[in-house]
């Protein structure tokens, strides 16, 4: 098809046939390169000088000669004189596309076809010149903010269902370029909406992005446009509508805001009829709906989505494109929480839609703030109805009026802490966050310059409220005194211009400011050399200029001369040390921090592991001792009790005065291993003191008192712990990032904590390091990892290398029993007589269909649960457990007397007989003692061999290398406890004095009544495969073998 360009035809605006106009407009846009599949032309500088068929174009790109004239009085017709000036200024020509042969050669068409347009049926790639032309065209159209009014019926999605103005066109920039090619000035129409749309356009204008072919971004669409979008790479394209996130998105969607992304609501319902899906769609994952409907409506893969749901969503999108949007707008506002929106203001807008005064009145701008409507929202500027304004004033206290979407943003602290302005999606102002109260603040509100942003990233920032609240001027170690008086010679250090130096008899001139030397040997000239290079030039074999190069006047080595010069300058300009606050003032400051209200963190301290290092293991020289009152378990070295010999009546330091409650001043965790400080009435956890660099212990053996509490920076006392979410005590920091948390909270939460032991210059240095949950995954069973020059020590490595205390051995040659068929259950009528019921004898030889534990209760058949029966035994007196015991022997004696009230035996779901709980047992409660005959290790080995020959199961528990408890023939019911890889009990070896130890089983978790009790046997994992004992616990983390 060839179209001559010499004749220009004026096209009249036909108001009757609107559909034909739309089709012709789209066709013209495609011909001019506005569409994705149109033809493109090469400029003259790429094809050479051809003097025929010069067609001028605006901004250096070709336009169609079929000029379009709008009948709207607001659009002026372009004069021919302006076109002639553009012809003179522009010397680019439009050429037909080059034709590529199959061999890759390029053929240039003859010059007689310069005034013709040949439609290319192939889809070739663009050249770089074409991309630059299209970018210039698109950027020019975007910067002009053109909005041409037309008579076409366009569908616009606004905040209310009944408001669908037809006089304002919301179209993409590519469609506008096809209509305003011949216009140099177009009127600017402010779009209706809030500040989100205006700031969005300004954001696009300030930061233009190079656009690729067929790639659309958030700046190409506006609120109400129908699009195709997908939420992920593996998700299908789904019809959606672009919404205004500030007014039409739910609060959860607004909180998960993603920069440079468009907020869309997908068509169709998810789950129920009242649920909608939302997403933030980035560039390249969003396309216009109408242009791509034929291509994307027949997607081959829907990635697990129901084709019926996709078809219903597509039908709803097509109805919305035709103007049926009432139900859609209702769903949008219902999901956004705008149920009480009054549409009277929008009806008034619709009546006055043609007035530009209304648009200037509604759209808020910086120049019109003093003329703000009294019913306009302070955050977005939207004018509220009288009824809505009265309601929002009643809900939100204060003088500022906020709409419902802006009021939602004030809850998650999306508001400036000084000017109280609402955070906007594309706010151009810079924000900083206070490290104390976590409130965002405009940098301009606190007079923070952009030059100091890098410094704020490395230091802590506090808002004016926190600075006034915590009185930071008392902290002398954090803030340098800028007003301190210097000495008389407070001028900067002035180095001498040059110094004569000597090396191996050769003189030279040293320039301290340049750190270079000019040799005076006579052959080098004025060339400046480095000290090491000049040293080699002089023939010195020392290879160390610091000692070989000397100053000629004083005969001092150059390095020593430089050090003396720096020391002299330091003494001359030494500042007068600032006056340090007194101990009384620092104590008052610390006590003021601790008087702030907080919620104490109540935790359950058990004897399973050390309360300081979290290790489970103990050794003969470093045993785990348990406080007789608070039941805190600590290592002797961790708590500083190496000289303690009587473990039966030992109490911790805090329990020596039980009438006074002790609490840690560095964290909100109650209880634990506490130690006194050098400040009276203040106590700290040993773990908290370890991870504060300013705190140390005066005595290494006793680990008390803790010194340096008053030297902790005050900024550490205003940090929010990410674990307990409280401001109390002093927080420590992750070694990889700026995450703050209490040391004890991190230890209880399973954070990775390490102790590094280094040796520098013959001196041992200890460094404590911790990691947040992002840089190291937390583990509830983690322990304090010790790194030394000889290696790394952790609980896992010791488990592999240390031979554990053996417990019970199970006979390995068990016979496999075939599973029997499921027995038929007979329904029982609870109101019938016992003699009328069917009696079915149970066969004990058959295996149960389901491996579950059955506790054995003596007393015959029972039709009621044990808890209900126990409530009827009012005559039975159950002795209450005393709150405290004078010694561990007394506690052990009470445990032996009452063990049958807590446990019983029964058929185990793991193996043979097992141990069960008669009642609920709390975490950390002592269950019973593992009793048996104590023999030497040699005797235990002989008995084990004899038991194997006789085919008996042996029950051996090793207390130490010399003593083993044999409960095979002599013992109590505790020997029936089975092994489990996920146990609910653990064993603790406790000393009762006179070098005698006992084994006590303690509940690891809360155990319910009738639940089987288990614990980990901790067999040696390094045994060969032929001695492996299979595990039958069937727990989720089963190790398959007990050793």
UniProtKB/Swiss-Prot annotation:
GO MF, any single term = histone methyltransferase activity
Q: What is its EC number?
A: 2.1.1.-
Q: By its UniProt entry, which Pfam families does this protein fall under?
A: PHD (PF00628), PHD_2 (PF13831), PWWP (PF00855), SET (PF00856), zf-HC5HC2H_2 (PF13832)
Query: May I have one GO cellular component term?
Result: Set1C/COMPASS complex
Tell me the ranges covered by the SET domain, including all copies: 901-1018
Q: Tell whether Ligase is among the UniProt keywords.
A: no
Q: What keywords are assigned to this protein?
A: Chromatin regulator, Metal-binding, Methyltransferase, Nucleus, Repeat, S-adenosyl-L-methionine, Transferase, Zinc, Zinc-finger
Q: Which CDD domains match?
A: ePHD_ATX3_4_5_like, PHD_ATX3_4_5_like, PHD_TCF19_like, PWWP_AtATX3-like, SET_SETD1-like
PROSITE patterns in UniProt: EPHD, POST_SET, PWWP, SAM_MT43_TRX_MLL, SET, ZF_PHD_1, ZF_PHD_2
- All copies of domain PWWP, residue ranges: 223-292
Zn finger limits (PHD-type): 719-776
Q: Where does S-adenosyl-L-methionine bind?
A: 911, 955, 978-979
Tell me which residues bind Zn(2+): 981, 1031, 1033, 1038
Stretches assigned to the Post-SET domain: 1027-1043
GO biological-process terms attached to the record: DNA-mediated transformation; methylation
| Principal location listed in the UniProt entry | nucleus
Q: Where are the zinc fingers (C2HC pre-PHD-type)?
A: 661-695
Show the catalytic activity: L-lysyl-[histone] + S-adenosyl-L-methionine = N(6)-methyl-L-lysyl-[histone] + S-adenosyl-L-homocysteine + H(+)
Tell me which family the UniProt entry assigns to this protein: Belongs to the class V-like SAM-binding methyltransferase superfamily. Histone-lysine methyltransferase family. TRX/MLL subfamily.
Function comment: Histone methyltransferase.
Return the protein name.
Histone-lysine N-methyltransferase ATX5
Q: Which organism is it from?
A: Arabidopsis thaliana
Q: What is the lineage of its organism?
A: Eukaryota, Viridiplantae, Streptophyta, Embryophyta, Tracheophyta
């Amino acid at each position: 098809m060839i179209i001559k360009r010499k004749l220009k035809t004026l096209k009249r605006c036909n108001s009757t046939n609107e559909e034909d106009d739309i089709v012709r407009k789209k066709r013209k846009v495609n011909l001019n390169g506005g569409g994705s599949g149109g033809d493109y032309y090469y400029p003259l500088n790429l094809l050479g000088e051809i003097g025929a068929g010069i067609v001028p174009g605006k901004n250096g790109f070709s336009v169609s000669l079929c000029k379009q004239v709008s009948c709207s009085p607001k659009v002026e017709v372009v004069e021919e004189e302006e076109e002639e000036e553009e012809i003179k200024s522009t010397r680019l020509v439009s050429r037909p596309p080059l034709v590529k042969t199959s061999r890759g050669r390029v053929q240039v068409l003859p010059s007689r076809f310069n005034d013709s347009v040949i439609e290319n049926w192939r889809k070739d790639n663009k050249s770089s010149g074409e991309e630059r032309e299209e970018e210039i065209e698109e950027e020019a159209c975007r910067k002009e903010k053109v909005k041409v009014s037309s008579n076409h019926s366009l569908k616009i999605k606004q905040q209310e269902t009944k408001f669908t103005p037809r006089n304002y066109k919301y179209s993409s920039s590519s469609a506008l370029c096809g209509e305003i090619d011949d216009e140099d000035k177009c009127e600017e129409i402010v779009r209706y909406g809030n500040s989100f749309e205006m700031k969005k356009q300004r954001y696009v204008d300030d930061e233009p992005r190079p656009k690729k072919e067929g790639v659309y971004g958030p700046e190409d669409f506006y609120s109400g446009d129908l699009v195709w979008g997908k939420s992920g790479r593996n998700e299908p394209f789904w019809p959606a509508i672009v919404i205004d996130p500030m007014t039409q998105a739910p609060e959860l969607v607004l909180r998960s805001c993603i920069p440079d992304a468009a907020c869309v609501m997908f068509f169709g319902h998810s789950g129920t009829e009242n649920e909608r899906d939302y997403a933030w769609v980035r560039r390249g994952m969003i396309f216009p709906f109408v242009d791509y409907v034929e291509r994307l409506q027949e997607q081959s893969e829907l990635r697990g989505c129901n084709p019926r749901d996709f078809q219903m969503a597509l039908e709803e999108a097509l109805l919305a494109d035709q103007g049926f949007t009432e139900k859609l707008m209702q769903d949008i506002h219902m999901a956004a929480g705008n149920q009480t929106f009054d549409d009277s203001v929008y009806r008034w807008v619709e009546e006055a839609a043609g007035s530009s005064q209304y648009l200037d009145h509604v759209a808020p701008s910086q120049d019109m703030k003093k003329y703000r409507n009294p019913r306009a929202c302070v955050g977005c500027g939207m004018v509220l109805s009288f009824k809505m304004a009265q309601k929002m004033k009643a809900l939100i206290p204060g003088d500022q009026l906020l709409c419902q979407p802006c009021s939602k943003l004030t809850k998650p602290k999306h508001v400036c802490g000084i000017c109280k302005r609402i955070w906007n999606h594309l706010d151009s102002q810079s924000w900083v966050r206070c490290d104390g109260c976590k409130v965002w603040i405009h940098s301009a509100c606190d007079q923070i310059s952009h030059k100091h942003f890098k410094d704020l990233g490395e230091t802590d920032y506090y808002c004016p409220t926190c600075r006034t609240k915590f009185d930071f001027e008392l902290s002398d170690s954090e803030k340098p005194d800028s007003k301190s008086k210097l000495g008389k010679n407070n001028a900067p250090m002035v180095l001498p211009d040059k110094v004569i130096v000597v090396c191996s008899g050769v003189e030279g001139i040293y320039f301290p400011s340049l750190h270079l030397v000019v040799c005076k040997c006579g052959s080098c000239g004025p060339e400046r050399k480095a000290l090491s290079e000049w040293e080699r030039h002089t023939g010195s074999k020392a290879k160390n200029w610091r000692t070989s190069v000397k100053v000629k006047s004083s005969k001092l080595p150059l390095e020593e001369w430089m050090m003396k010069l720096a020391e002299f300058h330091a003494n001359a300009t030494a500042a007068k040390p600032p006056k340090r606050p007194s101990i009384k003032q620092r104590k008052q400051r610390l006590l003021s921090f601790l008087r702030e209200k907080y919620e104490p963190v109540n935790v359950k301290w058990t004897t399973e592991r050390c309360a300081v290092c979290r290790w489970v293991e103990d050794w003969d020289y470093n045993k785990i001792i348990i406080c007789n009152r608070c039941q805190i378990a600590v290592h002797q070295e961790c708590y500083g009790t190496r000289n303690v010999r009587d473990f039966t009546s030992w109490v911790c330091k805090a329990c020596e005065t039980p009438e006074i409650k002790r609490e840690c001043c560095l964290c909100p965790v109650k209880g634990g291993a506490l130690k006194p400080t050098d400040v009276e009435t203040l106590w700290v956890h040993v773990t908290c003191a370890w991870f504060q660099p300013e705190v140390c212990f005066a005595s290494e053996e006793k680990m008390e008192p803790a010194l340096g509490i008053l030297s902790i920076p005050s900024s550490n006392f205003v940090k929010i712990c990410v674990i307990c979410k409280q401001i109390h005590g002093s927080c420590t920091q992750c070694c990889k990032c700026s995450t703050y948390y209490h040391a004890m909270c991190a230890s209880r939460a399973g954070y990775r904590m390490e102790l590094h032991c280094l040796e520098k210059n013959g001196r041992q240095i200890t460094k404590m390091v911790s990691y947040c949950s992002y840089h190291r995954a937390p583990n509830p069973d983690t322990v304090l990892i010790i790194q030394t020059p000889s290696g790394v020590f952790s609980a896992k490595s010791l488990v592999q290398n240390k031979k554990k205390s053996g417990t019970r051995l199970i006979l390995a040659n068990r016979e496999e029993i075939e599973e029997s068929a499921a027995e038929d259950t007979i329904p029982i009528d609870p109101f019938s007589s016992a003699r009328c019921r069917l009696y079915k004898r149970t066969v004990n030889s058959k295996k149960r269909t389901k491996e579950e534990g059955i506790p054995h209760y003596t007393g015959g058949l029972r039709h009621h649960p044990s808890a209900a029966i126990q409530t009827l035994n009012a005559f039975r007196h159950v002795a209450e457990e005393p709150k405290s015991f004078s010694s561990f022997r007394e506690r052990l004696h009470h445990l032996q007397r009452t063990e049958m009230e807590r446990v019983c035996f029964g058929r185990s779901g793991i193996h043979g007989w097992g141990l069960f709980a008669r009642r609920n047992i709390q975490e950390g409660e002592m269950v019973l003692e593992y009793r048996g005959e104590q023999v030497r290790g040699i005797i235990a080995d002989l008995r084990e061999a004899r038991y194997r020959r006789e085919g008996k199961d042996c029950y051996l528990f090793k207390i130490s290398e010399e003593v083993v408890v044999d409960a095979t023939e002599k013992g109590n019911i505790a020997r029936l406890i089975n092994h489990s890889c996920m146990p609910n009990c653990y064993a603790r070896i406790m000393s009762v004095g006179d070098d005698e130890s006992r084994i006590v089983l303690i509940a690891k978790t809360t155990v319910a009544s009738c639940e089987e009790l288990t614990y980990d046997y901790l067999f040696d994992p390094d045994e060969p495969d032929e001695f492996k004992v299979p595990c039958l616990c069937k727990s989720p983390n089963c190790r398959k073998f007990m050793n």
